[in-house]
């Protein structure tokens, strides 16, 4: 089984023709370059003025959040109450395609085509589909039911885990799992996508007993003494690295992930899916990443995800804060009434109270949250888990947000199949179709300009529902949430002429809006009372 792979020794490089002096000079060059480069290597992912970019072009849109369990099983189809999502490390022997072993090449093609160029990965809740009905029964045999969700840890040759298979060895790793992630990351760099890699999956530690019974670190499932409890809640114990054995197991695993993915420029590293853990573990995780960077001379995109108190503490840290390239604002928000929902870290708050519940937000409250952090940290990219709704997607963009992480299920086959089956090809998820016109508009007209644009307070009417991104004197993008009149201050660009166009985010249509001249205010009236965007582009041809 792929999960029982051996640990491979690093290949040693022999360079007998090099002198000792040559080696020292090369090492010094690497260290100097690494100390000054703020993004990935040339051709890979960079953070430019708070935007994800590659080769000078913005990467904006949705990110698919991966599937945790399930997949197509012959004779039963999908689980009707749970249409599964894409999973990079799902393995269906002999079957390739949606809901089986994903075709990574076709998947990444679909991502950049259909408006979700990002993908957020974490390992699955259990290995095989016998656990899909969420029972906690100990398996008496190894009669597994594919497809499998491969885990990062390898199986040992000792004992029997709760799922009837050999116990895990937490110091050995699954080569198939990491090969899949490396190949996906390589394709992301090639095509302009991003892998958001979660090292852990907190959901298994808190939500329900069925999610924890097969977890590799549970005492019944591994050969090491992890000190973990036999039942949930288990998160705070898992994150307690004052236990020497558990601390070293964490460090070994974290470094394995970095050894496998650290060369991949289009990867943003995140501590965990649904992380509501303590500040202490976040500090330990970041310190382990920074130590690896120092040892290797390589540079990582470190993402920060957690509760507001933990996120704010790290960003205020004079050592750790500057190393953060990406902020995830998923586990706190402003409600529609303006009050703050912000649970504290380290309280074992489950995902059903943060990432999974319907959010009582408005476009205005979402804009407020994103804009606040963009103002405080203008050079860091911002992502957030959120439902994909047109007005909120635009509020997120106008506040300076880079990518909306969404739990997008496979689209139904066209025409629908009976019984319920996955599509034969990767077609656009319904959620991605919501922003498809906007995604196409940005790629066609603003891909090179958006990295130089920032939220700007130059709107002079309906400020509570009209927002602007601007590169002064060159490009202006104004979003009117409810249509109506749009007035912007162009006083700092006297004499400059701008071509103005209306953009309909529902249809993707562009229509003329006239000409504006800098040096004062410019006013426009939306074609109707629905949301519209106004695009002003500097020109000398008018």
Question: What do the predicted segments below correspond to?
Answer:
Residues 520-522:
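Short strand-edge motifs at loop-to-beta-strand transitions and within beta-strands
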Residues 29-37:
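Hydrophobic h-region of N-terminal signal peptides that target proteins for export
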Residues 248-252, 261-427:
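Extracellular glycoside hydrolase catalytic/binding regions
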Residues 4-16:
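Short, Lys/Arg-enriched N-terminal segments with co-localized hydrophobic residues
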Residues 371-381, 389-514, 525-542:
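Aromatic- and carboxylate-lined catalytic core of secreted/periplasmic carbohydrate-active enzymes
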Residues 13-25:
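Bacterial N-terminal signal peptides that target proteins for export
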Residues 45, 52-98, 231, 235, ...:
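Extended substrate-binding grooves/exosites of carbohydrate-active enzymes
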Residues 45-326:
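Active-site mouth of glycoside hydrolases
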């Amino acid at each position: 089984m792929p999960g029982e792979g051996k640990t491979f020794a690093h290949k040693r490089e022999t360079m007998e023709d090099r002198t000792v002096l040559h080696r020292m000079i090369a090492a010094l060059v690497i260290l100097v370059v690494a100390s000054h480069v703020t993004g990935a290597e040339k051709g890979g992912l960079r953070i430019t003025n708070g935007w994800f970019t590659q080769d000078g072009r913005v990467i904006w849109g949705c990110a698919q959040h991966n599937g945790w369990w399930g997949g197509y099983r012959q004779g039963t189809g999908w689980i009707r109450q749970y249409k599964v999502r894409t999973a990079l490390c799902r393995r269906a022997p002999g079957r390739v395609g949606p809901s089986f072993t994903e075709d990574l090449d076709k998947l990444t093609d679909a991502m950049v085509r259909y408006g979700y160029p990002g993908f957020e990965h974490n390992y699955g809740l259990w290995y095989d589909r016998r656990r899909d009905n969420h029972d906690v029964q100990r398996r008496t045999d190894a009669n597994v039911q594919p497809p499998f969700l491969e885990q990062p840890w390898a199986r040992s040759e000792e004992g029997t885990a709760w799922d009837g298979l050999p116990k895990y060895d937490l110091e050995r790793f699954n080569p198939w799992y990491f090969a899949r992630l490396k190949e996906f990351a390589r394709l992301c760099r090639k095509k302009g996508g991003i892998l958001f890699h979660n090292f852990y999956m907190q959901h298994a530690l808190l939500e329900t007993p069925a999610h924890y019974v097969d977890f590799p670190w549970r005492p019944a499932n591994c050969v090491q003494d992890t000190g973990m409890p036999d039942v949930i809640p288990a998160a705070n114990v898992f994150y307690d690295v004052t236990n020497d054995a558990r601390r070293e197991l964490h460090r070994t695993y974290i470094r394995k992930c970095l050894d496998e993915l650290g060369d991949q420029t289009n990867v943003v590293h995140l501590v965990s899916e649904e992380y509501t853990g303590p500040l202490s573990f976040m500090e330990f995780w970041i310190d382990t990443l920074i130590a690896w960077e120092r040892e290797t001379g390589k540079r990582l995109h470190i993402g920060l995800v957690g509760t507001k108190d933990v996120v704010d503490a790290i960003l205020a840290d004079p050592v750790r804060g500057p190393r953060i390239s990406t902020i995830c604002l998923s586990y706190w928000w402003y409600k529609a009434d303006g009050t703050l929902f912000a649970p504290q870290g380290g309280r074992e708050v489950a995902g059903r109270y943060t990432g999974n519940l319907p959010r009582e937000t408005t476009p205005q409250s979402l804009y407020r949250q994103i804009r606040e952090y963009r103002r405080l940290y203008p050079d860091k990219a911002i992502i957030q888990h959120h439902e994909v709704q047109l007005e909120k997607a635009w509020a997120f963009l106008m506040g300076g947000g880079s990518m909306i992480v969404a739990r997008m299920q496979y689209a139904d086959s066209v025409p629908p199949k009976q019984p319920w089956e996955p599509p034969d090809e990767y077609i656009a998820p319904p959620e991605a179709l919501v922003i498809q016109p906007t995604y196409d508009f940005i790629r066609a007209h603003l891909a090179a300009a958006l990295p130089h644009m920032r939220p700007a307070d130059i709107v002079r009417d309906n400020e509570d529902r009209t927002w602007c991104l601007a590169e002064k004197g060159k490009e202006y993008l104004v979003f009117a949430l409810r249509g109506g009149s749009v007035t912007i201050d162009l006083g700092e660009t006297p004499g400059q002429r701008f071509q103005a166009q209306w953009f309909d985010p529902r249809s993707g249509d562009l229509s003329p809006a006239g000409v504006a001249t800098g040096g004062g205010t410019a006013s426009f009236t939306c074609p109707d009372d629905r949301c519209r965007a106004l695009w002003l582009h500097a020109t000398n041809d008018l």
